[in-house]
Amino acid sequence: MNTPMSLSAARGRMLPFLEKEKSEEESETLESSLLQLIDDNRRSSLQLREKTERSRKEAIRHAARTADLLVKAVNGGVEECFVNEKRIESEIRNLAITVAKFGKQTDQWLAVTHAVNSAVKEIGDFENWMKTMEFDCKKITAAIRNIHEDQQ
């Protein structure tokens, strides 16, 4: 019964059983390897997603910080311009008040100057009248002297 033919036949009959056992072991190993790969992939995807989320949040924080700094820089210039504009407007109002005061003073000086001119003119007129009166008085005096000399 243990002839080479019977052994090979027996082996042939056992081969499919061994192959089946081997293929089950291989499939279990393959299945566990695939499960391991899936688990590793899931873990790495989760880590990558977390890292991406952290990076995204950090980028948002940095962008917000940059935007705040830019706003502060721009607002600093705008604020300075606004302060300067208010200062200029205040100076304009003060200058307008000063110009109005000087205008009133100029009008007063013109009125005083006109009054002085009128007074000087009147003095000049009075001086002329006095000279005329003096001349007339001299004429009258001379006429009276002549009359008085003629009577003597």
From Swiss-Prot:
**Which tissue types show expression of this protein?**
Expressed in the whole plant (at protein level).
Subcellular location field:
Cytoplasm; Endosome
- BP term (GO), one: late endosome to vacuole transport
Pfam families on file: GCN5L1
Describe the inactivation phenotype. Longer primary roots and more lateral roots in the RNAi mutant.
One annotated Gene Ontology cellular component of this protein:
BLOC-1 complex
* Keywords of this entry: Cytoplasm, Endosome
Record-linked PANTHER family: BIOGENESIS OF LYSOSOME-RELATED ORGANELLES COMPLEX 1 SUBUNIT 1, BLOC-1 COMPLEX SUBUNIT 1
Sequence similarity: Belongs to the BLOC1S1 family.
Note the subunit structure.
Answer: Component of the biogenesis of lysosome-related organelles complex-1 (BLOC-1). Interacts with BLOS2 and SNX1.
Q: What does this protein do?
A: Component of the biogenesis of lysosome-related organelles complex-1 (BLOC-1), a complex that mediates the vacuolar degradative transport via the intracellular vesicle trafficking from the endosome to the vacuole. Probably regulates the PIN1 and PIN2 homeostasis through its interaction with SNX1.
Q: What is this protein called?
A: Biogenesis of lysosome-related organelles complex 1 subunit 1
Cite the source lineage: Eukaryota, Viridiplantae, Streptophyta, Embryophyta, Tracheophyta
Per UniProt, what is the name of the gene that codes for the protein in this document?
A: BLOS1
